[in-house]
């Protein structure tokens, strides 16, 4: 039996240069286990900033999943993150977090944040 998986999304910005412009389009997504999901964050003018994605699950501290390093044009996974599970990329002023092969434990709040390093 396949279970439906709810992925709740929230978008916050720790003190950053563009915090007033940081907006998330999607507030909630529900997907079946084994499927994929994409979360979009609007970040105008963020092409030279580090883009970070976090997961916050109930009763746990927020966990940084990955970040995009603009000077090397690469995605850096944090320690302990399974390669291929998450990816990020941009289209104009939008940054997307892609989640693959969803499981029940992927439920939580996903945050995008920007830093200048």
From Swiss-Prot:
Main role?
Probable non-functional open reading frame (ORF) of V region of the variable domain of T cell receptor (TR) gamma chain. Non-functional ORF generally cannot participate in the synthesis of a productive T cell receptor (TR) chain due to altered V-(D)-J or switch recombination and/or splicing site (at mRNA level) and/or conserved amino acid change (protein level).
| SMART domains, per the entry | IGv (SM00406)
Position of the signal peptide: 1-20
Q: Which UniProt keywords apply?
A: Adaptive immunity, Cell membrane, Disulfide bond, Glycoprotein, Immunity, Immunoglobulin domain, Membrane, Receptor, Signal, T cell receptor
UniProt xrefs under InterPro entries: Ig-like_dom (IPR007110), Ig-like_dom_sf (IPR036179), Ig-like_fold (IPR013783), Ig_V-set (IPR013106), TRG_var/const_region (IPR051117)
Q: Which cysteines are disulphide-bonded? A: 41-112
The chain positions of domain Ig-like read 21-117
Which GO CC terms are listed, alphabetically?
external side of plasma membrane; T cell receptor complex
Record keyword Magnesium present: no
The protein's name is Probable non-functional T cell receptor gamma variable
Gene3D superfamilies in the cross-refs: Immunoglobulins
Q: How does it assemble?
A: Gamma-delta TR is a heterodimer composed of a gamma and delta chain; disulfide-linked. The gamma-delta TR is associated with the transmembrane signaling CD3 coreceptor proteins following the stoichiometry: a single gamma-delta TR heterodimer associates with one CD3D-CD3E heterodimer, one CD3G-CD3E heterodimer and one CD247 homodimer forming a stable octameric structure. Upon activation, gamma-delta TR complex associates with FCER1G to initiate intracellular signaling.
Organism domain of life? Eukaryota
Q: Name one Pfam family in it.
A: V-set
Which PANTHER family has this protein been placed in? NON-FUNCTIONAL T CELL RECEPTOR GAMMA VARIABLE-RELATED, T-CELL RECEPTOR GAMMA CHAIN
Do you know which SUPFAM superfamilies this protein is assigned to? Immunoglobulin (SSF48726)
- Subcellular compartments: Cell membrane
Q: What's a BP term from Gene Ontology annotated to this protein?
A: adaptive immune response
Q: Where does the UniProt entry place glycosylation sites?
A: 105
Q: Does the keyword Electron transport apply?
A: no
